[in-house]
Curated annotation (Swiss-Prot):
Coiled-coil regions listed in the entry: none
Name of the protein described by the UniProt record: Cytochrome c biogenesis protein CcsA
Family: Belongs to the CcmF/CycK/Ccl1/NrfE/CcsA family.
Subunit relationships: May interact with ccs1.
GO BP terms, alphabetized: cytochrome complex assembly
Subcellular location: Cellular thylakoid membrane
Key words, A-Z: Cytochrome c-type biogenesis, Membrane, Thylakoid, Transmembrane, Transmembrane helix
InterPro entries assigned: Cyt_c_assembly (IPR002541), Cyt_c_biogenesis_CcsA (IPR017562), Cyt_c_biogenesis_CcsA/CcmC (IPR045062)
Length: 315
C-alpha cells in the first residue's frame, strides 16, 4: 500500500481520494436542496457529483494498482465501489431528467455510503490485503462487480420511488405515465390534422408531473438493476459450483440476495401485469431498499457465511 509519512503523519492517497469524494458530495447535498427550494437548475450539484465520481474512479484505479487485484475484496473497497456506482447511476438519471429533485433525493445515498466507509469502518478494514485463494478467480470481477452495480441501480431506483411520496402528496397517477417510460406522445385536442399536409405539429409531448417523472425513472433504474442482479446471481452460482461443487448453499448472503431478487421481481410484476404506478409499486421498491441494506451491510457486519467481510461478531 502506498502510504506517505511526514512528521508522524500518515497519508494514504486511496483514503484521501475517498474523503475528497465525500467532501464534494457533502457540498452537493445542500446545493441540491436549495435548487429545489428556489426552482433553479441542478447544474452545480451535478458538477459536484460528477467530480466526486471522478475521485472515486481514481481511487479504485489506484487501489487496483496497489493491490494487484480488482478493488472489491473488503468492505471498504466494496462501499467505495458502491458509491461510485450510485453516483454514476444518479448522473445517468439526471441526464434523462435534469431536475434538482433527482440530486436532492439520490445524493444522500452516495454520501452515506462513502461516509460509512471513510469514518465508521476501522482502519484495518480500509487497508488492502492479499486475496484469499478462493477469490483468486476471474469470476471475482464478473460476479462481484455486477452485483455491486445492481445494488447501485436498485438503491437509486428505490430512493427515487421514495421521492414519489415526497413531491406529490396524495395525487393520483394518470395511466398516461407508462411503465415503459416518459417519452410518450399524445395528439392535442386543440389542433387537428390538415387533410392535405397532415401537419405533424399537432403531435405534442405530454407534460408529466414531478412524481410521474420520478416514478418512470425509478422504474427504469430498477429494471436495469434487476437485470444486473439476475446476471450476478447466475454468475455467482456458476462460480460457487466451480469453487465448492455446489450451485447454491443457502449462505446468509445468498438467502438475502434471493429475497432481494424476489422483492424486485414482485415490483416489476405488479407494474407490467397489474398496471401499478405511483405509490403502490413505490412501497415495494422501498421495501427492497431495506432488504439490500440487510443483505449487503447487515450480513457482512455479523461476520457469518462465505460472503461476509466480517466486523463486530467475527472471531
Amino acid at each position: 500500500m502506498v502510504d506517505f509519512q511526514l512528521n508522524n503523519f500518515s497519508f494514504d492517497p486511496v483514503v484521501s481520494l475517498g474523503l475528497a469524494a465525500f467532501l464534494f458530495l457533502l457540498i452537493a447535498l445542500p446545493i441540491s436542496f436549495w435548487s429545489v427550494a428556489g426552482g433553479s437548475d441542478s447544474s452545480k450539484a451535478r458538477f459536484l457529483v460528477a467530480t466526486s465520481n471522478l475521485f472515486l474512479t481514481s481511487q479504485l484505479i489506484l487501489r487496483w494498482w496497489q493491490s494487484g487485484h480488482f478493488p472489491i475484496s473488503n468492505l471498504y473497497e466494496s462501499l467505495c465501489f458502491l458509491t461510485w456506482g450510485c453516483t454514476l447511476a444518479q448522473l445517468f438519471v439526471e441526464r434523462a431528467w435534469r431536475s434538482p429533485i433527482v440530486s436532492a433525493v439520490a445524493t444522500p445515498v452516495s454520501l452515506l455510503s462513502i461516509g460509512f466507509a471513510s469514518f465508521v469502518l476501522p482502519e484495518n478494514l480500509q487497508s488492502s490485503a492479499p486475496l484469499v485463494p478462493a477469490l483468486r478467480s476471474s469470476w471475482l470481477v464478473m460476479h462481484v462487480s455486477v452485483i455491486m452495480c445492481s445494488y447501485a441501480a436498485l438503491l437509486i431506483g428505490s430512493i427515487l420511488s421514495f421521492g414519489v411520496f415526497l413531491v406529490d402528496g396524495k395525487k393520483q397517477f394518470n395511466i398516461r405515465n407508462s411503465s415503459f417510460g416518459s417519452g410518450s406522445f399524445r395528439q392535442s385536442s386543440e389542433l387537428y390534422l390538415d387533410e392535405r399536409n397532415e401537419n405533424l405539429n399537432s403531435i405534442q409531448p405530454i407534460e408529466f408531473t414531478n412524481a410521474e417523472q420520478l416514478d418512470s425513472l425509478s422504474y427504469r433504474s430498477i429494471t436495469a438493476g434487476f437485470l444486473l442482479l439476475t446476471v450476478g446471481l447466475i454468475s455467482g452460482a456458476v462460480w460457487a459450483n466451480e469453487a465448492w461443487g455446489s450451485w447454491w448453499s443457502w449462505d446468509p448472503k445468498e438467502t438475502w440476495a434471493l429475497i432481494c431478487w424476489l422483492v424486485y421481481a414482485a415490483y416489476l410484476h405488479t407494474r407490467l401485469t397489474r398496471g401499478w404506478q405511483g405509490k403502490k409499486p413505490a412501497i415495494l421498491a422501498i421495501a427492497g431498499f431495506f432488504v439490500i441494506i440487510v443483505c449487503y451491510i447487515g450480513v457482512n457486519l455479523l461476520g457469518v457465511g462465505l460472503h461476509s467481510y466480517g466486523w463486530f461478531f467475527d472471531t
